[in-house]
Curated annotation (Swiss-Prot):
One GO term (biological process): glutathione catabolic process
Entry's Gene Ontology molecular function annotations: gamma-glutamylcyclotransferase activity; glutathione specific gamma-glutamylcyclotransferase activity
Gene: GGCT2;1
Name of protein: Gamma-glutamylcyclotransferase 2-1
Record InterPro entries: ChaC (IPR006840), GGCT-like (IPR013024)
Protein localization: Cytoplasm
Lyase in keyword set: yes
Residue numbers annotated as active site: 87
Cofactor requirements of the protein: Mn(2+)
Principal location listed in the UniProt entry: cytoplasm
Length: 216
C-alpha cells in the first residue's frame, strides 16, 4: 500500500514528514481560499489567523504538491499521525485525483488524501467564511501565534507558488493588500484592531512574472 497526500498550503514548502516522492500538479474542481481559522500556529483563539482551505468550485483547479510515502504501514502511520496533529483544524479528509501538466485528461494518481474543512460556521468552529479583501488582509497583517505571524504564512505561500511556476492571482492580490496594510502610517494602524472571530468564543506590488520581489 502507498500513501499519497496533496498539499496546497504550507505543505508545499514545508511538508515536515518523511516522504519518498514529490510531484507538482493540481486537483480539479477545487479552489484555494483563506477561509479557515488557525488558533494554535499562526494565530490565537482571541485573534485567529486566516489560513488556506479548499472550496468546491466546478471547473476550477488548485495547484500544489503531492507527496508519496512508501515503505509499509508503520511509515505511513507515522506520516498520517504527524499530519493529523498538524492539520487538526481541518475536520475532513477527502480523496481526490491528482493531475500534472504532462496529462491534463488522465490523473497520474487517484485516491490522494487532502485535508479539507466543512464550510459551515455552525458545525465547524474553525470555518471563518469569506470576507472582503481589506478585512482579510487586516486580519492576516495583525494575527500571530506560537509558530510566527499570519502574514509570513501568506508570503511564503505566494513565493512557493512562484517557485513551482504556478502563481495564483487570488494569493497575489491578498498578499499585496496585506503589504498595503503594513505600509499604513502607525497612527492609522493603531485604529485597525485585530479581527476577533467566533472561534475565540467557541474555543476560548505585483511585479512582472518570474521577477517578483517578495517583501514582507
Amino acid at each position: 500500500m502507498v500513501l499519497w497526500v496533496f498539499g496546497y498550503g504550507s505543505l508545499i514548502w514545508n511538508p515536515g514528514f518523511d516522504f519518498d516522492e514529490k510531484l507538482i500538479g493540481y486537483i480539479k474542481d477545487y479552489k484555494r481560499v483563506f477561509d479557515l481559522a488557525c488558533i494554535d500556529h499562526r494565530g490565537t483563539p482571541e485573534h485567529p489567523a486566516r489560513t488556506c482551505t479548499l472550496e468546491q468550485s466546478t471547473g476550477a483547479i488548485c495547484w500544489g504538491a503531492a507527496y508519496c510515502v512508501r515503505g509499509g504501514p508503520e511509515k505511513e502511520k507515522l506520516a498520517m499521525e504527524y499530519l493529523e496533529r498538524r492539520e487538526c483544524e481541518y475536520d475532513s479528509k477527502t480523496l481526490v485525483e491528482f493531475y500534472t501538466e504532462n496529462d491534463t485528461s488522465t490523473p497520474i494518481v487517484t485516491g490522494v488524501i487532502v485535508f479539507t474543512s466543512t464550510p459551515d460556521k455552525v458545525s465547524n468552529k474553525y470555518y471563518l467564511g469569506p470576507a472582503p479583501l481589506e478585512e482579510m488582509a487586516r486580519q492576516i497583517a495583525t494575527a500571530s501565534g506560537p509558530c510566527g505571524n499570519n502574514r509570513e504564512y501568506l508570503f511564503k505561500l505566494e513565493k512557493a507558488m512562484f517557485d513551482i511556476e504556478h502563481e495564483e492571482e487570488y494569493v497575489i492580490e491578498l498578499a499585496n493588500e496585506v503589504r498595503k496594510q503594513l505600509d499604513l502610517p502607525e497612527e492609522v494602524k493603531a485604529l485597525l484592531k485585530p479581527i476577533v472571530s467566533h472561534v475565540s468564543v467557541k474555543s476560548q506590488a505585483h511585479v512582472s512574472t518570474r521577477q517578483r520581489v517578495f517583501a514582507s
